[in-house]
Amino acid sequence: MAFAFPDSFRFADSHEYANADGELVRVGISAFAVDQLGDIVFVDLPDVGASLAKGTSFGSVESVKAVEDMYAPIAGEVVQRNEAVLASPEELQNDPHGEGWLLVLRPSDPAELDSLMTAEAYGAKVNAG
């Protein structure tokens, strides 16, 4: 199965995405990662106000197959978390690049987005294998 990713998204090697929206950045996990996990039963996210360092764990996603940590693709402060996904983890599974987003961050350094893979590069990586 080939996956398509929104052109505006940037991706970390660990399958999290960052999508800039003005001064804020929406963070989630890719459709590829969701597909690999299978049926998602629980999502754990940090509280609003938490400060995240790039590459550090910010929560976990539990499926019937595994529990996987999620890592911050950029550094920043959590300004919003998706309560709908916490209440109904299947939202993440149904629309990971849309309604299934996880966090909104105020980035510490917006230039960090440039260090992430483009949608094209990420797509080539995950679809190759």
Curated annotation (Swiss-Prot):
Positions of post-translational N6-lipoyllysine modification: K65
ATP-binding keyword on record: no
One of the GO BP terms on file: glycine decarboxylation via glycine cleavage system
CDD domains for the chain: GCS_H
InterPro entries: 2-oxoA_DH_lipoyl-BS (IPR003016), Biotin_lipoyl (IPR000089), GCV_H (IPR002930), GCV_H/Fam206 (IPR033753), GCV_H_sub (IPR017453), Single_hybrid_motif (IPR011053)
Assigned keywords, A-Z: Lipoyl
Cofactors: (R)-lipoate
Keyword Acetylation (UniProt): no
GO cellular component, one term: cytosol
PROSITE patterns tied to this protein: BIOTINYL_LIPOYL, LIPOYL
Chain coiled-coil ranges: none
Cofactor note: Binds 1 lipoyl cofactor covalently.
Domain Lipoyl-binding: 24-106
Pfam family of the protein (one): GCV_H
Family the entry assigns: Belongs to the GcvH family.
Free-text function comment from the UniProt entry: The glycine cleavage system catalyzes the degradation of glycine. The H protein shuttles the methylamine group of glycine from the P protein to the T protein.
Quaternary assembly: The glycine cleavage system is composed of four proteins: P, T, L and H.
Listed name of the protein: Glycine cleavage system H protein
